[in-house]
Amino acid sequence: MLVLGDSESMTSISPMELWKSVGITRYICGQSGQRISESYYMLKHALDYQSPQVVLLETNMLFRYTNTPDSLRSSISDTAMYYFPVLQYHNLWKNIVNDQIPEGWQSYKGFAIRSGVAAYSKGSYMKKTKKEKEIPQINLWYLDKIRKLCEKNKIQLLLYTSASPVNHNYKRYNAVLKYAGKYGIPYIDFNQKLKELGIDWKNDTLDKGDHLNLSGAHKITDYMTMYLQEHYMLPDHRGDEKFTSWDTMASQ
């Protein structure tokens, strides 16, 4: 199973917890500020080497606006990185040199372990409305490409939105729900399940409602573990010699 998205995807569902509880292998291909065009080419590249049964796409990046010339330049750049991998590695090194990986972060299969707490205290943010937040056309175009790529490779696509008062609202929920309904794609909005999850914004966010911390991620992961077991036939790889690296990392 692969996960696509920006930093919200890196802090919401823990691959190590999924592994320890049910033996599901899951790798997060997200990165801070990731554009959906990058997600598409990252998935396309991953499929050259892997055959995931499920792809999870965290939806925050769908609403990232860029002007048309910037969007075009980004798309051309992402295409070039796919066909010329040396450019991709150069970009990864550039991120490290520019300190885009914060000091003190630990990463396990793409999951960023962050246990700090900075409470969110601005109250309710999911106020019902029939209005929708517009998803930029270029983002819809790449979302369609991801959907079609998954269909072509017989991969089940699952959309989800991490709990985040800073980034999410009901207008965004309506927009994603409309797209998911149009194409029969399952969609989980964790902002609609705060009571069920037991999310406490005094303790479960790292940075005042932008990202979940480790405590919040535990709650999302518990829910997702049950959901995946109920809706997908994903194999339990615990005890398989090919996956000993997962046991090693889980013990750390």
What are these regions (language model features)?
Residues V3, I28-S32, K130-P136, Y160-V166, ...:
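Second-shell loop/turn segments in exported
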Residues P69-Q156, G239-Q252:
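Secreted/periplasmic serine-hydrolase-like ester/acetyl group-modifying domain
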Residues T205-W246:
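Histidine-centered active-site loop/cap adjacent to the catalytic His
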Residues V3-L4, E8-L87:
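Membrane-embedded segments
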Residues V54-T66, I113-L197:
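Conserved, well-ordered alpha-helix/loop/beta-strand core segments that scaffold catalytic motifs
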Residues D48-S51, K148-K152, T225, Q229, ...:
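Sec-exported extracytoplasmic/periplasmic mature domains
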Residues G33-S37, Y49, K133-W141, N167-Y170, ...:
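Soluble non-cytosolic domains of exported or imported proteins
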Residues I13, E17, E38-M42, V54, ...:
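Extracytoplasmic/secreted proteins, especially bacterial periplasmic and envelope-associated proteins
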